[in-house]
């Protein structure tokens, strides 16, 4: 740590760090708190910021006030991003829970998102296993396992074979 940064108040250093973290991508409040509490890698190894709990709360409040930190925006973008990567609603819910997002906020965002999960599950299955999808039981089980791992719901997975005859 340089001489000038060691003289800066802990609040200013935390605020600077929070803005740099949030400039890269949106984070949940819990993620930001965890990253702010983590030691900073300095020239001589990890260095702690000796900030009080009040400093952390002021930084979080400032980020909320100035629009840098918004859990609802984070949830909406996270759902869109993960669904584009081929993950289903169950897996997305689990990941949001791990990131400290409440179940109510997650369910609200899942209802508001405009994602056709049935189309996505079919797209994932055909991308991985080709068109037409196998009808042999052992192959169907393999596809179901893959799609369940990706976080899709069993009723959506079974619909791809029900609509297969169309």
Curated annotation (Swiss-Prot):
Xref: Pfam families: RecX_HTH1 (PF21982), RecX_HTH2 (PF02631), RecX_HTH3 (PF21981)
One GO term of the biological process aspect: regulation of DNA repair
Compartments, record wording: Cytoplasm
Keywords from the UniProt entry: Cytoplasm
Cysteine-cysteine disulfides: none
Function: Modulates RecA activity.
Sequence similarity: Belongs to the RecX family.
Name used for this protein in its record: Regulatory protein RecX
Organism from which the protein derives: Shigella sonnei (strain Ss046)
